[in-house]
Amino acid sequence: MAYPFQLGLQDATSPIMEELLHFHDHTLMIVFLISSLVLYIITLMLTTKLTHTSTMDAQEVETVWTILPAIILILIALPSLRILYMMDEINNPSLTVKTMGHQWYWSYEYTDYEDLNFDSYMIPTQELKPGELRLLEVDNRVVLPMEMTVRMLISSEDVLHSWAVPSLGLKTDAIPGRLNQTTLMAMRPGLYYGQCSEICGSNHSFMPIVLEMVPLSYFETWSALMV
């Protein structure tokens, strides 16, 4: 869950988000080292009286500043590709949920059940109860079992939307006429909030997403009551 004046990313709830946090730290360290080196060189140039105005050729330096950036790019690309393949891999999902974006709400259909579907609208500010979050609460939460692989099929009925839940490391575009898919697995129970992350019209800011991750026994009870 995000909080005011937060500087870092949200706490990881899924294995994918944990990998993304590690990759963020890895890349940030490389950027910090490069920035420190550049700042050191600039400071050295401004403070030293040594100049090389007569230097016409420096093949050793050219070789270093060609090979070193290539190595740095490889160090960034390899873990990035690994995470991309992890995000694209879908193996035997335990549950499939179809998500459709609309202007301006989400609809959900549990395809493994015969008649389990609902729309999810944002709760207006004037109807919020004490402790509920402004612009993030919905009338129907998406209840899912924790510690199980869930496949999300995502599309749109009208314009471009984007289904995103930061703490799970999820962001998938909802495109009219196209069905995108992603997987999620939460390692602990709780409420996880997201929002539409593609500008989709005047009420784009009023399309929250709320996932309620629960133990399997609770999910089975909930699904039986909903059907």
From Swiss-Prot:
One of its GO terms (cellular component) is mitochondrial inner membrane. The keyword 4Fe-4S does not apply. Binds a dinuclear copper A center per subunit. It is a multi-pass membrane protein. PANTHER family: CYTOCHROME C OXIDASE SUBUNIT 2, CYTOCHROME C OXIDASE, SUBUNIT II. This is Cytochrome c oxidase subunit 2. Its EC number is 7.1.1.9.
